[in-house]
């Protein structure tokens, strides 16, 4: 079983369903995101594998795998679309970490997909992130890193080039400590 917290378009839930899982719950608290996720999941023919639920973060159930790709930058969103980019005071990230252990089955894992762009922009430190993980009763079981391949990572005329060229997106494998 798996949960996709903050599913947005439903893409992570769909990838999980396509790869190997058949019992997936995808949650979001934004009505437009829920509508989009339901539309995409139905169009992909995955409606029997994925259940889309309205929730602030977690469903009531536990799972073997809980994934989350929260907004990457601490900041105040000024429009609904910006809620996918900015996470005021890192609220969603902190709440995901704080609630993760309670929503994992024994031996389960949480997968946090997060860019370190905020670190390169001095908006958050790695030490803060690791502190939040530890405070939540979690430990890092592993991490997979990927360098971005989008054009802005290589555009030295971009105002954020110094940060973007160092950016790494990571899949943090988290387990109960």
Task: Put a short name on every predicted segment.
Residues 72-73, 115-120:
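Short "lid" loop at the C-terminus of a central beta-strand within the Rossmann-like core
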Residues 108-114:
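Conserved beta-strand signature within the Rossmann-like core of class I S-adenosyl-L-methionine
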Residues 93-106:
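A short glycine-rich, Lys/Arg-flanked "PGG" loop and its adjoining helix->strand segment in the class I
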């Amino acid at each position: 079983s798996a949960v996709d917290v903050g599913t947005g378009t439903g893409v992570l839930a769909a990838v999980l369903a396509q790869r190997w899982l058949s019992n997936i719950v995808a949650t979001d608290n934004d009505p437009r995101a829920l509508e989009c996720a339901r539309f995409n999941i139905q169009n992909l023919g995955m409606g029997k594998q994925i259940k889309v639920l309205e929730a602030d973060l977690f469903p009531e159930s536990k799972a073997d795998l809980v994934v989350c790709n929260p907004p990457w930058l601490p900041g105040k969103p000024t429009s609904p679309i910006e809620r996918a980019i900015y996470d005021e005071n890192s609220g969603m990230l902190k709440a995901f970490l704080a609630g993760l252990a309670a929503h994992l089955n024994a031996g389960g894992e949480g997968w946090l997909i997060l860019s370190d762009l905020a670190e390169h922009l001095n908006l958050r430190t790695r030490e803060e992130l690791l502190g939040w993980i530890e405070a939540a009763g979690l430990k890092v079981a592993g991490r997979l890193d990927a360098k971005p391949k989008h054009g802005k990572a290589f555009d030295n005329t971009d105002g954020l080039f110094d940060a973007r060229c160092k950016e790494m997106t990571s899949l943090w494998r988290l387990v109960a400590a």
